[in-house]
Amino acid sequence: MGLPWYRVHTVVLNDPGRLIAVHLMHTALVSGWAGSMALYELAVFDPSDPILDPMWRQGMFVIPFMTRLGITKSWGGWSITGETVNNAGIWSYEGVAAVHIVLSGLLFLAAIWHWVYWDLELFRDERTGKPSLDLPKIFGIHLFLSGVLCFAFGAFHVTGLFGPGIWVSDPYGLTGKVQPVVPAWGAEGFDPFVPGGIASHHIAAGILGILAGLFHLSVRPPQRLYKGLRMGNVETVLSSSIAAVFFAAFVVAGTMWYGSAATPVELFGPTRYQWDQGFFQQEIDRRIRASKSENLSLSEAWSKIPEKLAFYDYIGNNPAKGGLFRAGAMDNGDGIAVGWLGHAVFKDREGHELFVRRMPTFFETFPVVLVDEEGIVRADVPFRRAESKYSVEQVGVTVEFYGGELNGVSFSDPATVKKYARRAQLGEIFEFDRATLKSDGVFRSSPRGWFTFGHATFALLFFFGHIWHGARTLFRDVFAGIDPDLDAQVEFGAFQKLGDPTTKRQIITRLI
């Protein structure tokens, strides 16, 4: 046909059999990618330290999605929570990957079959014998089936009635595990951080989809609406399908970036707003105050802080710190975390407790400034020592560690104090192994950042695709000169004047 590359989909425009074939092949590719990617991630994933080297630090992308749906065990004998497993069963990480690859093969064969046997009687009108598809009825079938699937997921899988439940954790990502979820039918169900809303919304949306599907199967659209929305044109289906996809992509980009019950911190890493708002820092402060009210010493209080919570309060885990074009996992940036050094408390020679101002998200460099509890600047690491008034040396700043590996250790040497002051800008201080992966010290984003960027970008592209194909189908008569009220199926090139009712039945003969 000599079609340019951007027009090749024209070949399936009026060919339902091969339209099915290409969709089957596309689904085969998606399923095959998911299974293959899962096997690759399992080959490189190190499950030995779920606290300081979790899946999101290692750049895992598909493993978190399997985990949030209830998969936690591996045929390799490990569990995502750190326990040893003897019998992982069929629904392990490897089992799910294998099922996707087998499904991909079956879909591949089905695609070939439908490409070869494309002209089925199913696609022909019984009365006329001409190719035709009842698109409103097909829409009703799809709506009904997707409604059944949606309802079943919410009513059975998420609730644990017939399934494992989903990953549920506390707001600070410390106690996560897979468990059944009770549907939340009140106002709390609309809170994006309440897991019960996932169950109730899938149940409600599923029922709505089932009812809407039955409606579209039993009620025909009015003729004016049918023609006005071009319901007989398969490009209308394409346009509305793209709309559904781009809307879903925008929604999940938002729930991933801003956080939700469906995107737990333990599986995808913290959000940037948790650093901006000092979310984990405030919880740590609350716990320290609670411990001090029980007459525990500062050292004992900080020793009770979970290392997992302290690690969240570190800017290197902020997905917005990694540039979009810095490829690789977080571990390839600042390294593999091996231990918490403890909480650094700075004091000047007058006894004021000093706090290092933390680096905002979108700064690569930031002045080291130490303030007291009233926000008054007491010390800094100056850019120009000749004009300094508050340098560590002049003010006599010391640092002491509470909790962690350096618990009880103090330093008064200015060079050491300045080193830890610079590191305290980045939150809690950790020791990193940069040799194993040859980490370059430049922050990377987490899968949360990559997912958001990818889905927001493709949602925008698909939005324009929806506008494009919607305009093509709505204004087809304007673009091609075909009257939208023309009932007869037009065969291109067989008429003296395209779409002219007076010439549509004219027979052109050749005299030999």
From Swiss-Prot:
Protein name: Photosystem II CP47 reaction center protein
GO CC terms of this entry: chloroplast thylakoid membrane; photosystem II
Any GO MF annotation of the entry: chlorophyll binding
HAMAP family reported in the protein's UniProt record: PSII_PsbB_CP47
InterPro entries, per database record: PS_antenna-like, PS_II_antenna-like_sf, PSII_PsbB
Task of the protein: One of the components of the core complex of photosystem II (PSII). It binds chlorophyll and helps catalyze the primary light-induced photochemical processes of PSII. PSII is a light-driven water:plastoquinone oxidoreductase, using light energy to abstract electrons from H(2)O, generating O(2) and a proton gradient subsequently used for ATP formation.
Source organism of this protein record: Physcomitrium patens (Spreading-leaved earth moss)
Gene3D superfamilies, alphabetized: Photosystem II CP47 reaction center protein
Protein's membrane topology: Multi-pass membrane protein
Keyword Iron-sulfur: no
Description of how the protein assembles with itself and partners: PSII is composed of 1 copy each of membrane proteins PsbA, PsbB, PsbC, PsbD, PsbE, PsbF, PsbH, PsbI, PsbJ, PsbK, PsbL, PsbM, PsbT, PsbX, PsbY, PsbZ, Psb30/Ycf12, at least 3 peripheral proteins of the oxygen-evolving complex and a large number of cofactors. It forms dimeric complexes.
Plastid among keywords: yes
GO biological processes: photosynthetic electron transport in photosystem II
Similarity remark: Belongs to the PsbB/PsbC family. PsbB subfamily.
Binding note for cofactor: Binds multiple chlorophylls. PSII binds additional chlorophylls, carotenoids and specific lipids.
Signal peptide boundaries: none
Keywords: Chlorophyll, Chloroplast, Chromophore, Membrane, Photosynthesis, Photosystem II, Plastid, Thylakoid, Transmembrane, Transmembrane helix
SUPFAM superfamilies with a match to the protein in the record: Photosystem II antenna protein-like (SSF161077)
Subcellular location: Plastid, Chloroplast thylakoid membrane
Transmembrane segments: 21-36, 101-115, 140-156, 203-218, 237-252, 457-472
Subcellular location, principal: plastid
